Amino acid sequence: MSVLQVLHYPDERLRKIAAPVKEVNGEIQRIVDDMFETMYAEEGIGLAATQVDVHQQIIVIDISENRDQRLVLINPELLEKSGETGIEEGCLSIPEQRALVPRAEKVKIRALDRDGKPFELETDGLLAICIQHEMDHLIGKLFVDYLSPLKRQRIRQKLEKMAKLNARAN
């Protein structure tokens, strides 16, 4: 397994729409494993393939404290959503920035697992929020898209400043 490079906003590759996975095979499983490795290395709880410049409908999630409840969503479909909630979300592609994002409280999804077996999942709370956040990535949407243009511009400026400082340090 290897750690992949995470794309950072405003990289336009984050806006690409992911294609459905045609066949879950060894190559897809390797991508899934590398995505988990990357997510854990970056201390995240979810990662969409788009964020590592793989434009296929693959999501990995693990919201557990012990990093032992891996969830793989290949070609996820939202079947139902209900209620309203929201938390201050962060994103590995938008480092050190957080914002309140409105989300459905409960979701029901259908997807394929790491072995290509179909399953349905009904959930709420942090897992439901994380699923919605990662599914947004698959259609080129970021949490900053839910913000006002002014807030979005401020975040972009902060990230550009951070990138310049990091470039100088290296």
UniProtKB/Swiss-Prot annotation:
It catalyses: N-terminal N-formyl-L-methionyl-[peptide] + H2O = N-terminal L-methionyl-[peptide] + formate. The active site is at residue 134. SUPFAM superfamilies: Peptide deformylase. It comes from the Bacteria. Binds 1 Fe(2+) ion. Removes the formyl group from the N-terminal Met of newly synthesized proteins. Requires at least a dipeptide for an efficient rate of reaction. N-terminal L-methionine is a prerequisite for activity but the enzyme has broad specificity at other positions. This is Peptide deformylase. It comes from Yersinia pestis.
